[in-house]
Amino acid sequence: ADGGEASMCLNGIRCAAAYVWRNNFAPKKIIKFKTKNRIVVCEPYKNQVKATLQIPSIYIDTKLDKKIAKLTSDKFSLVDAGNMHLCIKSTSVKNKDLNSIYKNLEKLIKPLGFNLSIYKLSKKIADMRTYENGVGETFSCGSAALAVASLCIQDKFKTISPGGELNFIKKNNANIEMMGPTKYIYSGNINV
């Protein structure tokens, strides 16, 4: 990681909620998190954590769209999901060189803070991979999954990334729920 700060981390927020409940820092009920640009409401859900937030919006930049279209023939969308994401629909995800795709687009998208996701759609499921600015390819990115889901969802949707699955339910025209597991790995102390 390059030390840069993201606007939010949805998987991190879900893990923070699970940590609070696990350690009895607050009752096991709704917790609201305020990020740089979103309110995320978390609540327990069948041994998982459900996060509810506003449906992402399409980012409109016709000049950027034209520049990206010169570098990829695949359908793509620019999405503001709390973090900015360039989502490219592909016929394959596993066999793609995500690093090369990112490097090809980096000069256009990195200065604007766009992460890159490629996804393959199959009915109500998207297989996906994400390259985050300053990090590289990640096992799972919650805001990327949210961005892809927002492009494809009618009522229910699932994303599958190398790190696992997230499920989405569109609640109305304004909100979407994201459900997924959290896993407690270890705890430690830092002396300062």
Where are these regions (language model features)?
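Active-site proximal loop and beta-alpha junction motif in alpha/beta enzyme cores
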Residues: 1-8, 13-140, 147-192
